[in-house]
Amino acid sequence: MKKRARDLSIPFEGICGKNNAITDVAGVEVGYTTIIKGEATADTNDDSDFARTGVTAILPRGKQKSAVFAGRHDLNGNGELTGTHWIDDSGFLHGPIMITNTHSVGIVREATSKWMVKNRF
């Protein structure tokens, strides 16, 4: 099992939740999926049927449709953060937080938008 910061004696203020997980916060819901397809070899090329990817969805207030306060920080300017202009302008986040690899940002944004419309989020 991967060690957590507290296991390495890195100090944090406060007390851990029961599971030391984001889902210890009341109302937070998390879902994820991972796609592992094919085998990588030295001969794997662009035409191969090979994938290692995934996405994590975090609903800060579960299925409640109210916004949460939000802020952001760019560590090094790499990667994509869809929706940052709204966070900068309003200080709020309305909807799920989606975590994926840079190459999947577009399709994840599209799927999230469709999910939000379908669920009237």
Give the ranges of each region predicted by the language model:
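Alpha/propeptide regions of enzymes that mature by internal proteolysis
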Residues: 1-121
